């Protein structure tokens, strides 16, 4: 059992985001006037807004839809001035210890190149340092 960090309950998070999408809960922030790169359709979606709550994207809507749900004084609205927003890249398999740098340093380098998610296989440090190595790596990556 890992006790040093907690993961939000998926069911509670889903209910919360559903309530945001339905206008029952005010999102933490809304990004307006966005152009969004769709990697599914290879197109740019224009005049969109993104509702964000608890660090997650709740939904993407047409620009100014939030005015139909919320008083604009109740929500933080940021105009992204028609900048193109794109999803982050995902590194699906890597070994931080093989890179010869710490997890924190690796994350900084990856972010500079657009990678926002990394799945790390930690068997090497686990084989050498057992659970102490895994705990150290988790702590370093925070």
Model regions: which residues?
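General structural signal for secondary-structure boundaries
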Residues: 49, 62, 101-102, 133
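N-terminal metal-binding scaffold of metallo-dependent hydrolase/deaminase domains
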Residues: 1-71
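Alpha-helix N-cap/helix-start motif
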Residues: 45, 99, 127-130
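Catalytic metal-binding/acid-base residues of hydrolase active sites
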Residues: 37, 95, 123-124
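Short, low-complexity, polar/charged sequence segments that are solvent-exposed and flexible
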Residues: 50-57, 96-97, 108-111, 138-139
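Glycine-centered flexibility motif
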Residues: 23, 39, 61, 88-89, ...
